[in-house]
A protein has these predicted regions:
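Phosphate-binding site recognition
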Residues: 1-333
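A cross-kingdom feature that marks ATP-driven nucleic-acid transaction machinery
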Residues: 299-463
Length: 463
């Protein structure tokens, strides 16, 4: 399969490699995000030793590592070395004048099997490796572990890295490259269902319609995506049943702790613990109105992974019927009527990403420091209001609406947005209004935008 995206990360790795000096690079990110694919692309044409740690004991892993080491280095075997210290000293001798990429994937497994490995690495980096030509990559999927136990200040490895790369899911603009045969609308729809995880994106075939992909690649019980969320949770967690209940509760509309407790039927303290774990896995996030402190009581829980959100909304509650092969029934009755709502929510994220790109390309009248959604009380109308896009900086704020509908955006929508902006943010002098529309704008709105610098319009053709 063609290598897609990650050009910045690949360029950074190539730049570090070209120094011909010792490097220790930490690469981490949630499962399925493409860490191994990035590393595999990077090591093409380079001498490399790749070792993936497993949930095994340290001695068994050291034996496997030594076997791979002798084979990769084309060195005569002297058997399994008696310690990891000896292993890395051997590598240090081999790489004094030899550029080698050493990759230890799933490092948290090794660190949990051998409590001393981090201190061993600290010692060998300081006394043996730093004057070699070794290009050392430590890779892991347990994000919280990598941040605390590898990159954290209290880790023995603190200060030993020369670079770190946290791989994030693809934005829409990288994800769309998986579907070059789809038009922009279908590309957005696919992204709203699959999110930015490369492995999920690669399952869809843009030679087929979206409907056929949903049925064949998600709802069909033999497909990879049909059981992916369940399998991933089993791999990461000991009590997947309780986590299933929480994720399903959020996917079907519960956003506060009280609502999640009510829907999942789990005790409040258990829910809090499980939510913390899901946030560490980057599957759930706590969203707060943009500009408010993290401690804000108005925070809500939402599923961070778009595919998990889709799966727990439509697949998980309909498993019994899907096991019977009732794919068409579930699609037509349960999914098809709800897809516009799903696309509308996903479109907001795509608009945020587009607006950030506009900032990066210097196409906006002023910079902003944070972007997101805003919700809260309207003191004038005495009701709750939502703003799809709110981006503020020292020179003003952008206030936006993102419309995924078949009708053109008209002046009524514009007037409502301006009214909300004036009522909700009276202290902000410089307000620029932003409208995103799937179906374009009426001629009246276009005329206003031509004359008014405080209004910006974006259609799908601008993506």
């Amino acid at each position: 399969m063609m290598f897609i995206g990650r050009q910045e990360e690949l360029a950074e790795l190539d730049n570090l490699y070209s120094t011909d000096k010792f490097q220790c690079v930490i690469i981490y990110g949630r499962r399925r995000v493409g860490k191994t694919t990035l590393i595999s692309e990077f090591v093409k044409g380079k001498e490399a030793l790749f070792f993936a740690a497993t949930e095994n004991n340290s001695d068994s892993m050291r034996e496997e590592f030594c076997n791979r080491m002798y084979q990769s280095l084309n060195a005569p075997s002297i058997g399994t070395l008696d310690s990891w210290q000896s292993v890395f000293q051997f590598i240090a001798k081999e790489t004094r004048d030899r550029r080698l990429v050493l990759v230890i994937d799933e490092f948290p497994y090794l660190a949990k099997a051998d409590k001393e490995i981090k201190s061993v690495l600290q010692n060998v980096i300081d006394h043996y490796l730093k004057n070699t030509k070794l290009f050392f990559i430590l890779c892991g999927s347990q994000v919280s572990f990598m941040e605390k136990e590898v990159l954290g200040y209290n880790s023995p490895l603190y200060g030993r890295r020369t670079a770190q790369i946290k791989l994030e899911p693809f934005s829409f603009f990288d994800s769309r490259e998986f579907f070059p045969k789809y038009d922009i609308e279908k590309q957005i729809q696919a992204y709203c269902m699959l999110g930015g995880i490369p492995l999920y994106l690669s399952q869809f075939d843009d030679n087929d319609s979206l409907e056929d992909n949903i049925k064949g690649k998600i709802l069909r019980k033999y497909s990879y995506l049909y059981e992916e969320p369940k399998n991933l949770l089993k791999q990461e967690l000991r009590e997947p049943m309780n986590y299933n209940a929480i994720i399903e509760a959020i996917a079907t509309g519960a956003t506060t702790l009280n609502n999640i407790v009510g829907k999942s039927k789990l005790p409040s303290d258990h829910c809090s613990k499980y939510l913390k774990t899901l946030m560490e896995l980057l599957l759930v996030e706590r969203e707060i109105p943009v500009g408010e402190p993290k401690s804000s009581r108005r925070g809500i829980y939402r599923i961070q992974d778009a595919f998990f959100k889709f799966w727990y909304r439509f697949v998980f509650p309909n498993t019994s019927e899907l096991e019977l092969g009732m794919v068409d029934d579930i699609f037509n009755e349960e999914i098809l009527p709800e897809l516009p709502k799903n696309y509308g929510q996903g479109f907001e994220l795509v608009c945020h990403q587009h607006f950030l790109r506009e900032l990066k390309e210097h196409r906006l009248p002023f910079r902003f420091s944070h972007i997101g959604r805003w919700w809260g009380n309207n003191p004038v109308m005495r009701r709750q209001e939502e703003i799809d896009l709110f981006a503020a900086g020292k020179d003003g704020a952008y206030i936006g609406e993102c419309k995924w509908r078949n009708e053109k955006v008209d002046k009524t929508i514009l007037d409502n947005l301006v009214c909300k902006g004036q009522q909700l943010f009276p202290a902000i002098d410089n307000k620029v209004y932003v409208l995103y529309s799937k179906s374009g704008f009426t001629s009246e709105v276009k005329r206003i935008a031509k004359k008014d610098n405080s209004l910006i319009l974006y259609g799908l053709e601008d993506f």
